[in-house]
Amino acid sequence: MFCAGQTDNKLPFNFQDGREFRVGDCALFRAVDVPPFIGFIRWIEKKEGYPKLRVSWLYRPADVKLNKGIQVNAAPNEIFYSFHQDETSAVSLLHPCKVAFLRKGVELPVGISSFVCWRVYDIDNKCLWWLTDQDYINVSSFILPVFIYYIHSYILLHI
């Protein structure tokens, strides 16, 4: 099993058709009658046939339900990281996708085609937090340390 934060997490899982996925990748996942789901691959457990994946889901604005029916004001390509995780079969993987995890106020450079994630969707409390807010760390401290390290490293190194 390969988990986010492990030293061997850069080892890819290769499909026979040439697709390649790693822990820490974002990908599109097959869905029925709706746009593909977007997920952050947290671990891959290799098994015979298709491996199992642990995925943290990223939500599109239309899927975010806030308190008191407040409407989400979001950029056209904005998505929201969440603490919602599931195990799923790799058979549902479509292909990798780009997600730029950015600090509040940082814009995606012109010419870059990507989803953008500035905020976290707290499903239980039905609210949004900025990725760099410290207030929500106690909400799901069992998930956040590796993710925050990964995201802050990405923000500092890639943007």
State each model region's role.
Residues 1-18, 47-149, 156-159:
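Epigenetic mark-reader domains in eukaryotic nuclear proteins
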Residues 34-47, 54:
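Short beta-strand-centered aromatic/proline hotspots
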